[in-house]
From Swiss-Prot:
This is N-acetylmannosamine kinase. It holds the Pfam family ROK. The lineage of its organism: Bacteria, Pseudomonadati, Pseudomonadota, Gammaproteobacteria, Enterobacterales. It comes from Escherichia coli O6:K15:H31 (strain 536 / UPEC). Belongs to the ROK (NagC/XylR) family. NanK subfamily. The keyword Plastid does not apply. One of its GO terms (molecular function) is ATP binding. Pathway: Amino-sugar metabolism; N-acetylneuraminate degradation; D-fructose 6-phosphate from N-acetylneuraminate: step 2/5. PROSITE patterns: ROK (PS01125). Transmembrane segments: none annotated. The gene is nanK. Catalyzes the phosphorylation of N-acetylmannosamine (ManNAc) to ManNAc-6-P.
Length: 291
């Protein structure tokens, strides 16, 4: 059975056909609509899936935000155009006439990345550092989503009580500091208004402020990982996302994690499926019908 997998992120929408063998084909991307309206997202999703839907028997969605009862609740509305209570499952069922499931994108990615690990690992955490910071937890060989879909939203844990206000409404969240948006927001002077990709480029060219911003992000993530080790005793942490997979970033995180007491050290791995983990994880979960 072929799954039409969809990944809804803060900057892009992706879709692909995924067979029972896990092979990804006919992958397509569109920018996430800048307009803060449900109709804009519906129209973009329609354009994305229309060339693919005839070749699939079901739909699996991985989306940023909390997924509850098939609807999207954007914990940080800034990451998805201010959408709240968007009926993801209902919308895709109407567009495709196919049975549909939905799950948080980082939770989906965690499940895909777990499948790529050695068989003796039963407990792992996936962290995505991209437009925002998200995560997924596998414990005892099972994906933990929680009764309300909140499990794994580790980007909204405290990093600095005196830090910037996060889009979720809390102060000093990891996401507000370590994410691509957090890096860009903190930029000043000639870097003001630059996005995270530009800041990474400037850091590689020796720009001191850019390097400091990236170190701040990596240090914040390392402290989060130490906290995760303390709370889950996971065997490894897998890091993905456009920031997490940026050249040199994971090595910086490892350097800062090494400064923590040894009890909080844990193996860090780069995401095996890189930017396709959400798509694949959603398809795998649809195959297992575990949602």
């Amino acid at each position: 059975m072929t799954t039409l997998a969809i990944d809804i992120g803060g900057t892009k929408l992706a879709a692909a056909l995924i067979g029972a063998d896990g092979q990804i084909r006919d992958r397509r991307e569109l920018p996430t609509p800048a307009s803060q309206t449900p109709q804009a997202l519906r129209d973009a999703l329609s354009a994305l899936v229309s060339p693919l839907q005839a070749h699939a028997q079901r739909v699996a969605i991985a989306s940023t935000g909390i997924i509850r009862d098939g609807s999207l609740l954007a914990l940080n509305p800034h990451n998805l155009g201010g959408l709240l209570h968007f009926p993801l499952v209902k919308t895709l069922e109407q567009l495709t006439n196919l049975p549909t499931i939905a799950i948080n994108d980082a939770q989906a990615a965690a499940w895909a990345e777990y499948q790529a690990l050695d068989g003796d690992i039963t407990d792992m955490v996936f962290i995505t550092v991209s437009t925002g910071v998200g995560g997924g937890v596998v414990s005892g060989g099972k994906l933990r989503t929680g009764p309300g879909g909140l499990a794994g939203h580790i980007g909204h844990t405290l990093a600095d009580p005196h830090g910037p206000v996060c889009g979720c409404g809390r102060t000093g969240c990891v996401e507000a500091i370590a994410s691509g948006r957090g890096i860009a927001t903190a930029a000043q002077g000639e870097l003001a208004g630059a996005n995270a990709k530009t800041i990474f480029t400037r850091a590689g060219q020796g720009d001191e402020q850019a390097q400091q911003l990236i170190h701040r992000s990596a240090r914040t993530l390392a402290r989060l990982i130490a906290d995760i080790k303390a709370t889950t005793d996971c065997q490894c942490v897998v890091v993905g996302g456009s920031v997490g997979l940026a050249e040199g970033y994971l090595a910086l995180v490892e350097t800062y994690l090494a400064q923590e007491p040894a009890a909080f050290h844990v193996d860090l791995l780069a995401a095996h499926y890189r930017h396709d983990a959400g798509l694949l994880g959603a398809a795998l979960l649809a195959q297992g019908e575990k949602l």
